[in-house]
């Protein structure tokens, strides 16, 4: 059985649409849905049960964030397989069953993620490589990857350099859809998802921890879901969230590489590149009211 865990925080309509899509499209596998409400104030979470009476509703008396909320849901889960699914996603087919088949047939898989699109149909960059000095330099000086053959560039860089049109192993996956075996948590610190981050970049941390334990993470292009992305955040908050994510990514690199010369060189390159881009995006937002993704 698959236990699908969804976190709700003041996104009642988005969450209801997500739940509706799960119950509509999931046909080939037994499943349960656990909804963790992170102390929402927008509406009584008990209203979800009016439309979804089979739902397991878990109420938290405070906002535990993404990792903390999922750990709370996992404690209530009965499945051998766990799916973390963002509340601002919608299934368009039986993506859970398709992903489960991949998890069960591939060897030594940590997490399985799937292809995602924005509501307008544009693909999201959900399969990525871990950050490194070489990756940051190639991303900064884009004429370098431009000189590579297209397939080589896509596989080496992933992210925005990859069309997400084929399934492959990757370093880390977007946490909006993460399927894994419950047994994987037995190998994790404290036998749970690492919750040192309240929100943002925790998916990268978990994928790194799975890799350290001999697992690989797999991007599945055979099924697609819709992901609003930051559905519970305003546009201004999204820009602020990016800065938080960058700080967390630096903390992850520090964990992996330590505080030696590699970390400091990386921080200079990464900081210059990402903070400059964020400043441009903020300036553009001030002028137009629109966010560059």
Region locations from a protein language model:
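Conserved donor NDP-sugar-binding/catalytic core segment of glycosyltransferases
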Residues: 93-127
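A conserved acidic beta->alpha catalytic loop
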Residues: 12, 21, 35-45, 62, ...
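Non-catalytic, C-terminal membrane-associated alpha-helical segments of glycosyltransferases
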Residues: 237-293
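Short, acidic, metal-binding catalytic loop of nucleotide-sugar glycosyltransferases
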Residues: 20-30
């Amino acid at each position: 059985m698959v236990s699908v865990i969804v976190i709700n925080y003041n996104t009642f309509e988005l969450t209801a649409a997500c739940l509706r899509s799960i119950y509509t499209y999931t046909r080939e596998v037994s499943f349960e849905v656990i909804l963790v409400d992170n102390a929402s104030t927008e509406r009584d979470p008990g209203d979800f049960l009016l439309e979804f009476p089979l739902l397991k509703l878990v109420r938290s008396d405070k906002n535990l964030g993404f990792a903390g909320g999922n750990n709370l849901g996992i404690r209530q889960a009965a499945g051998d397989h766990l799916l973390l699914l963002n509340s601002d996603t919608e299934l368009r087919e039986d993506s859970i069953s398709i992903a489960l088949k991949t998890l069960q047939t591939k060897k030594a898989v940590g997490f399985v993620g799937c292809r995602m699109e924005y509501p307008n149909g544009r693909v999201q960059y959900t399969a990525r490589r871990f950050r490194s000095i070489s990756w940051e330099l190639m991303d900064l000086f884009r004429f370098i990857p431009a000189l590579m053959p297209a397939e080589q560039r896509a596989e080496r860089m992933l992210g925005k350099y990859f069309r997400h049109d084929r399934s492959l192993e990757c370093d880390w996956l977007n946490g909006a859809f993460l399927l894994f075996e419950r047994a994987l948590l037995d190998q994790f610190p404290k036998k749970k998802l690492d919750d040192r981050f309240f929100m943002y970049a925790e998916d990268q941390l978990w994928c790194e921890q799975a890799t350290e334990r001999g697992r690989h993470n797999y991007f599945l292009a055979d099924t697609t879901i819709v992901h609003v992305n930051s559905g519970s955040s305003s546009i201004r908050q999204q820009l602020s969230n990016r800065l938080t994510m960058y700080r967390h990514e630096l903390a992850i690199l520090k964990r992996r590489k330590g505080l030696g010369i590699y970390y400091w060189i990386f921080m200079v390159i990464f900081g210059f590149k990402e903070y400059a881009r964020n400043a441009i995006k903020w300036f553009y937002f001030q002028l137009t009211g629109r966010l560059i993704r």
